[in-house]
């Protein structure tokens, strides 16, 4: 009797999740929502890490080579720092746009090729048979779920968190870069930032399993973690007030840190010979 109970408990159960929309009830797939969120989170993570580190390296090199002494004679230090952050950020956005255009082009070409293949009589029977297979049904189900996503909302919020997260971390790293005298000293400042971003990255992936859990909700409001965590939660549906509060806190903190980093930058870029410390 005990063995039968254990076997019943271990019986696999398929649970269909349902998402309510303005048009009514629609079946949803958690895996697709998670995949979309994880993809966007990964983009933000690698963009902020790569181009934020580039800002820090650029500031450090200019200070080490004393190039910055010539620059500050023409522009204010805060303007120089802001221009550097915006310039490198625009380079990154341009690169992302190129990748996006190439991806759309590849998908379009693949669609045209598959459309031409459908008119080939020799493949008509094979295509007709394949359409009856479970894989075809799964593809249609995936397309249906993707079409039910708030794509416009996801796109707008992705851009906002993309820009806000970059401005926040790039401002901090620019201030750190101005405080060091040797590029090798940047490691002690880069490590805490890397740890925070890794925590935000893994917190985002954990939130995919429980997007409305306490960790996911609280990390959505913390500016250092919200860009990664919120992009995981948005495909599942997030209240408007949470989105508005999260974006407001992110940009407010980014502006405050930009101002503080500007103060550090103004003093640090012309300070030599002192060992930086945390």
What is each model feature region?
Residues 78, 82-99, 103, 157, ...:
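Alpha-helical transmembrane segments of multi-pass membrane proteins
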């Amino acid at each position: 009797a005990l063995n039968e109970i254990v076997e019943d408990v271990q019986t696999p159960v398929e649970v269909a999740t349902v998402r309510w929309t303005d048009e009514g009830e629609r079946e949803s797939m958690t895996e697709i929502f998670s995949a979309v969120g994880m993809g966007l989170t990964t983009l933000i993570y690698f963009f902020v890490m790569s181009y934020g580190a580039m800002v820090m390296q650029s500031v450090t090199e200019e200070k080490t080579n004393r190039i910055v002494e010539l620059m500050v004679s023409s522009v204010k230090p805060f303007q120089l720092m802001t221009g550097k952050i915006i310039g490198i950020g625009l380079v990154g956005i341009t690169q992302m746009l190129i990748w996006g255009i190439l991806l759309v082009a590849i998908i379009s070409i693949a669609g045209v090729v598959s459309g031409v293949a459908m008119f080939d009589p020799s493949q008509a029977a094979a295509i007709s048979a394949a359409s009856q297979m479970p894989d075809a049904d799964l593809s249609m189900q995936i397309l249906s779920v993707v079409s039910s996503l708030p794509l416009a909302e996801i796109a707008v919020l992705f851009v906002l968190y993309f820009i806000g997260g970059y401005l926040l971390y790039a401002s901090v790293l620019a201030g750190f870069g101005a405080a060091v005298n040797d590029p090798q000293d940047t490691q002690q400042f880069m490590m805490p930032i890397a740890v925070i971003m890794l925590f935000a990255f893994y917190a985002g992936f954990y939130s995919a399993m429980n997007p409305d859990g306490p960790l996911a909700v609280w990390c959505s409001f913390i500016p250092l973690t919200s860009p990664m965590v919120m992009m995981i939660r948005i495909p599942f549906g997030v209240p408007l007030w949470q989105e508005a509060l999260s974006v407001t806190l992110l940009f407010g903190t980014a502006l405050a840190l930009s101002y503080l980093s500007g103060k550090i930058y103004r003093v640090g870029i012309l300070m030599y010979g002192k060992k930086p410390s945390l």
